[in-house]
Amino acid sequence: MRLRLIAVGSRMPRWVEEGWQEYVKRLPAELSLELVEIPLNTRGKNADVARLIRQEGEAMLARVQPGERVVTLEVEGRPWSTEQLARELDRWRLDARTVNLMVGGPEGLAPEVCARSEQRWSLSPLTLPHPLVRILVGEQIYRAWTVLSGHPYHK
């Protein structure tokens, strides 16, 4: 099974990369979790933010192949418990399609990305810093896998 986190923003602090890698390396070989970084467009004082978001969205969608599943991470999405995420992960595995988890930039996702989404997932009603979201997603995917495999990590 292949999961891909497509996130706007690059050049994260070292602790973010280390946190992400910690959970990626714990996953079994049959569950691949890849990070794809989309460069954040420069936001100047007079920037056309809508245009920048649209460009970032186009870059995100360019990484998605036809037939692949798109899941957006949005505050307005549906919150999943660990057990619900485990059920989704199992469903995705049986579906046998690559799953793309989409995380937008500071202003969120482009409407085109949201329109392509098959599912909308909310990590929290809180506004979370994007570097932390990467680690949180990695940990939650690992935790969901441990639920499915009977591993004692999730008790």
From Swiss-Prot:
It comes from Pseudomonas aeruginosa (strain ATCC 15692 / DSM 22644 / CIP 104116 / JCM 14847 / LMG 12228 / 1C / PRS 101 / PAO1). The lineage of its organism: Bacteria, Pseudomonadati, Pseudomonadota, Gammaproteobacteria, Pseudomonadales. Specifically methylates the pseudouridine at position 1915 (m3Psi1915) in 23S rRNA. It is found in: Cytoplasm. GO terms for molecular function: rRNA (pseudouridine-N3-)-methyltransferase activity. It catalyses: pseudouridine(1915) in 23S rRNA + S-adenosyl-L-methionine = N(3)-methylpseudouridine(1915) in 23S rRNA + S-adenosyl-L-homocysteine + H(+). Coiled coil: none annotated. This is Ribosomal RNA large subunit methyltransferase H. Its EC number is 2.1.1.177. GO terms for cellular component: cytoplasm.
